[in-house]
Amino acid sequence: MLPEILKLRSTFTQYFEIVPAFSDALRDEVFSIRHQVYCEDLAFEPRRPDKRESDEYDAQSLHMLIRNVRTGEFVGCTRIIRVRPDDPQQLLPFELSCAKTIDRSIIDPATLRRSSIAEISRLAIISPYRRRKGESRKPAPMSDSDFVMISHPRFPFIPVGLYFGTVELARLHGIETLFFLTEPRLASHFKKLGVRIQTIGPAIEHHGLRIPSMMSTSTVINDLKTILRPLYHTIAKEIEAGLTDASSRATSEPAGRVLQAAVTK
């Protein structure tokens, strides 16, 4: 078991690193990837003249990238949409799109402390890294064959790395519950990793069938399979390094140049 554990971590670090996107330049990379995937490849959103996809939720979000360490190319991204601190009753996007379908006997987001919840969205991977058969029309693909064995060479390092980074970034900002709209099979994929994703309502149509779901950051960390813990801890260190760097810039740059969410919890 130990060689497999070490191989999983070493393989990830040999090819990829997680980079919190707290600077203007890094957020620009996020918006560029999103335009490539959501506007050009999938046509989920209209193309923009500046080739940057962004919306009204980006200013209140925590953004993250994954980079190919061999080429320096950023190959994927995601974000965590937080409730605005100046408007705690603001509804997250899934609360609007699933207002009539959330099973509030399972969980009612309206009753939770708003600063402790957030929504994962805009997870995207550029096309050269999702070109296996049947995956080109998905922003961040995974398949059953990826999970035959966790140490299998097809292990989906990019989407798993982004999800692990999201959980750790959320934890560091006091977010306990993460909501998201997911493809129907994602819960079964992540169950193989020891990650419990709970469905909180029936599927809705949102660029294909999407199921409103949730996961607890503390439960994900506590229940993670042993073989994956070193990988998670490596990603956690990369997140922490990004936060430290952002905090350092905040003391030396003019106010407003660094994303406020990066240095406040």
Residue spans for each PLM region:
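Acyl-donor binding region in acyl/amide transferases
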Residues: 85-214
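Hydrophobic alpha-helical segments and helix pairs
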Residues: 77-80, 87-88
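Accessory, usually C-terminal, subdomains that scaffold auxiliary metal cofactors
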Residues: 194-252
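Glycine-rich phosphate/pyrophosphate-binding loop shared by adenosine-nucleotide-utilizing enzymes
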Residues: 71-77, 118
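Structured alpha-helical
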Residues: 49, 92-97, 156-160, 173, ...
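Short Gly/Pro-enriched turn/cap motifs at secondary-structure boundaries
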Residues: 53-56, 203
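Short amphipathic alpha-helix that is part of the acyltransferase structural core
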Residues: 4-52, 59, 63-70, 79-82
